[in-house]
Swiss-Prot record:
Example GO molecular function: carbohydrate binding
InterPro entries: F-box-like_dom_sf, F-box_dom, PP2-like
Protein name per its UniProtKB record: F-box protein PP2-A12
Domain F-box, chain residue ranges per copy: 25-71
Organism of provenance: Arabidopsis thaliana
CDD domains in the record: F-box_AtSKIP3-like (cd22162)
Top-level taxon: Eukaryota
Pfam family, one: F-box
């Protein structure tokens, strides 16, 4: 009986008239889902997915439309309509975000667009096949070569030419912000040798004599021009063509024209690989990968 009395005393000392005292200690799992959603809104998308594994409340909040709408571009409807040709109805915002964070092709697969998973900024890439390149149809000058070093699985390679000119344009509903435009180039032709990356630079010539000129224009009068000598061989480099500011007044769609030229016909140029033109939010440009 003494043992039973002792056990009863211990049970009473660890409980109260309201039940086990541990039940009275609030935890993260006791927070209302609406409150958790407010907390989760302040996290970036990667962190939201991690916190969704904590408990049921965080898992439920991680599916809330209000949370994911705050992570989508302000004009996400326009962006989706541009990519898909229409807006997908009856989809949760989380699914819309998941779709946009993947790389999506449009315009006959010559353009790809996605949103940065940390900042939700819109990024866009235009393949060499989506650009106007002088002499591209003459195989004496240019050829398209397959490669796994491009998002588009091929690049334009220049053997030799006197008049070098590349032009392009993009008409896209970029959200309000500042964007940087880059040409992704490499001096040399990369390939594989016994499974290892190699880059043949034997045909590289003419780029260290006169600089290449980059230009860009917008419909609202913005203009940028810069010159650069191409000197580094064997690596993909993003050459900055300029920046564009997208304002509230033209947020429905922004048309950007750009060019890269070296038209001094006193010498030939050759051995250049042209992959793409990329448009990144200026705040994300440090994330550009270099091969």
């Amino acid at each position: 009986m003494g043992v039973a009395h002792s056990d009863l005393h211990n049970d009473l000392s660890s409980s109260s008239c309201f039940g086990d005292r541990n039940i009275l200690k609030p935890g993260l799992g006791d927070l209302p889902e609406a409150c958790v959603a407010i907390i989760v809104e302040n996290l970036d998308p990667v962190e939201i997915c991690r916190f969704s594994k904590l408990n049921r409340a965080f898992r439920g909040a991680s599916w809330a439309d209000c949370v994911w709408e705050s992570k989508l571009p302000q004009n996400y409807r326009d962006v989706l309509e541009k990519i898909l040709g229409g807006f997908p109805e009856n989809l949760q915002k989380r699914h819309l975000y998941a779709f946009l964070s993947r790389i999506n092709s449009f315009d006959d697969a010559t353009k790809k667009v996605w949103i940065d998973k940390r900042t939700s900024g819109v990024c866009l890439s235009i393949s060499a096949k989506g650009l106007s390149i002088t002499g591209i149809d003459d195989r004496r000058y240019w050829s398209h070569i397959p490669t796994d070093e491009s998002r588009f699985s091929s690049v334009a390679y220049l053997q030799q030419i006197w008049w070098f000119e590349v032009d392009g344009e993009i008409d896209f509903p970029f959200p309000v912000g500042t964007y940087s435009i880059f040409f992704r180039l490499q001096l040399g032709r990369s390939g594989k040798w016994f499974g290892r990356r190699v880059c043949n630079t034997e045909q590289v010539h003419g780029w260290d004599i006169k600089p290449v000129r980059f230009q860009l224009w917008t419909e609202d009068g913005q203009y940028s021009s810069s010159q650069c000598m191409l000197t580094e061989r064997g690596n993909w480099i993003h050459y900055h063509a300029g920046d564009v500011v997208v304002r509230e007044s033209n947020r429905s769609s922004t048309k950007i024209k750009f060019s890269m030229t070296q038209i001094d016909c006193t010498h030939t140029k050759g051995g250049l690989s042209l992959d793409s033109v990329v448009v990144y939010p200026s705040s994300c440009k440090d994330q550009l990968k270099r091969f």
